[in-house]
């Protein structure tokens, strides 16, 4: 099991009840605005926008905020910012490779925030390409387990291009090529299977096994990075056991 995948789903669940709720909402709204700007406001022809809206709704972002973000992105309402996507690369404690995906209207601010978070939490910046080769862009769909068995999920998505289904404890992770993400998500919907999120993420090709101390260090680093308004996603190639995850979550 990918420690980062399990951490991400746990973090995702906790984020709506902690002090970072407003920050999470702002990042979800930003995703919607950019998706509308890049692909248009019609969700039927813009699956990225559809997924961004669904993700926001599942986190209880108010509909009026979602509608305004779509309109700003589509140029139908004033106030939209000129965001750009920037990827930063680095290494965390214990040699963990880290990719930081920023969505920002201020490149200098984003670079400064990332560098400060890295250097203050045992990390270091790396040259472009020195870390990204350790990851592949994949479609990642998270499915709440509920009463589902792994075979139920696998049977629904296999013909849609899914490559594997991983058990994350309270949920299943469905991996596919990024180009098959919409097909996999649609197959789940047609099978009546609810999903928590559907994203094109960077998935590591190899992982660093961490002990409890190492896990706490990398979690502190990722928390510091995600505290920046400009950081949308953090991907890292670590793995931890279920026992260590329980200790860290305690």
From Swiss-Prot:
It comes from the Bacteria. Its main location: cytoplasm. One of its GO terms (biological process) is regulation of DNA-templated transcription. One of its GO terms (molecular function) is DNA binding. Pfam families: TACO1_YebC_N, Transcrip_reg. Keywords: Cytoplasm, DNA-binding, Transcription, Transcription regulation. It is found in: Cytoplasm. Belongs to the TACO1 family. This is Probable transcriptional regulatory protein SCO1521. It comes from Streptomyces coelicolor (strain ATCC BAA-471 / A3(2) / M145).
